[in-house]
Amino acid sequence: MKIIFLLQFTSLLSMLINAMLLGLGSLHVRWKNRRYEQSRWMLFAAMLILAAHFLAQMTLSVRASGADLGAVLNLLAYPPSFALIALSIYNIEAVHDNRRRFVAGIVGLYAIIVVCYAIGYCCNGSMRIGMWMYVMLALYICLVVYCICKASRQILVRRKLLETLTASDMLPHVRFAKTSVTVLFVASMTMPFVILFNKILVIYAPVILLAIFFFVLTFCNLG
């Protein structure tokens, strides 16, 4: 399990580096946009949540005790961090201020995930919650799909608006941002299946870390 520990340590450092890039990047912005800065700190919070998650995995040796235990902890930590990332995208791309409905959907789905964990814990007396883990997994996928649909719709609307109102030289920048978001979403959709198997996780996790780092760099370039 040494390789799992090294992977968790690498993930922890990666999230801290991402958070540092986002936090220090704010100091170099001369003219600040309110929505962009809101999204920056949403991403910053998401990176800190993930960093805290990997630190907990390391100190508690959860995944070393079993892939199922690690998966349960992942399913509790990933939804809020992914939701913050999706909300940061939505916050920038939305042409109208309709975030409350989006946030309400996210909070509702995550609340159900937590309730499922609580029921499984009460029924089994430990974090080995059996079939309830798969219920949590299904709900996480629903949350990811919900966020993808909402954010992608706003990206499409904004793209059409830019095509109509701005010069064409803005479009490569928009396509670059869309590509990074797509990579991140694909990683988020495949991750629930990977976390159940340690051997696959060791191979696939570096791809996820690179996708998140690429997304953070893209976000910083937008500023």
State what each model feature region is:
Residues 1-19, 137-141:
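Hydrophobic transmembrane alpha-helical segments in integral membrane proteins
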Residues 17, 73-84, 135, 139, ...:
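Membrane-embedded alpha-helical segments of multi-pass membrane proteins
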Residues 27-42, 67, 90-102, 126-129, ...:
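Membrane-interface helix-boundary motifs at transmembrane edges
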